[in-house]
Amino acid sequence: MFQTRRRKVERLDFIVAGAQKSGTTALHYFLAKHPNITMGDQQEIHFFDDDATFAATVDYERLHKHYPLVAPSTMAGDCTPSYLYFKPAAERIWNYNPKIKLLVLLRNPVERAFAHWNMQRFKGREPLDFFDAIREEKTRIAGAPPTEARRFAYVDRGFYAHQVERLLKFFPRDHVKVVKFEEFKDKQRETLASIFSFLGLEPLRSVRGKDRNVVPYERAMNWEERIFLYNLFANDIAKLEQMLGWDCSDWKL
């Protein structure tokens, strides 16, 4: 039998760039199941948000070493949700491969903020209660190292409009697919088919759902917190609706 010649990955074909706590782990799972995709040896490689990597001549082999030899038709992807939020990442990715495709999942920013805080509490990294944390966020992240700042950026990560705008400054609209988390969750098969089509691939023949790795919630978000956050996000949600042609009424109070 003839063996297909395998090649070394020299450029990634796509990246799942965000947003954190918006279904990216599940999307990574389904992408990795596709026979024509490799997602490398780990989720969240964090190459393009590592300032030390870009302080001198960039060695992209440090990225590509995470990928096996692949068939000519295999696409290589990464899933690092912090890239959407980390300001230098878009330009760094464009310099690396201006033809790359980007996938972005966006969740109701109010729910995303609470899920983010809950994850930090679960990991033992967050001493503050949620309302205290979101009210003190600006002070906490001001001047903090990037890794620490984004760890506690519960609100700031939810201002999606300017983050998506930053991607579109570098990449053409047909190379950036933005998906609502709620649609991905409720219409998973159809949404996945659309994502694979965007990548130029056939859909998976069968879609077995990923077992959810649910972090138990310490408590529920109260109404005061929900109103406070929605008032912060309302203008940005409206801007996102206009930019993407979305209906985000399910994100509103």
Residue ranges and their predicted role:
Residues 81, 142-156, 212-225:
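Surface-exposed cleft-lining segments at the edges of enzyme active sites
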Residues 165-253:
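The conserved 3'-phosphoadenosine-5'-phosphosulfate
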Residues 93-95, 197:
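Short, surface-exposed basic-aromatic patches at helix termini and helix-loop junctions that form
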Residues 1-85, 95-100, 105, 109-145, ...:
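PAPS-dependent sulfotransferase catalytic core
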Residues 88-93, 191:
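Distinct, well-ordered alpha-helical segments
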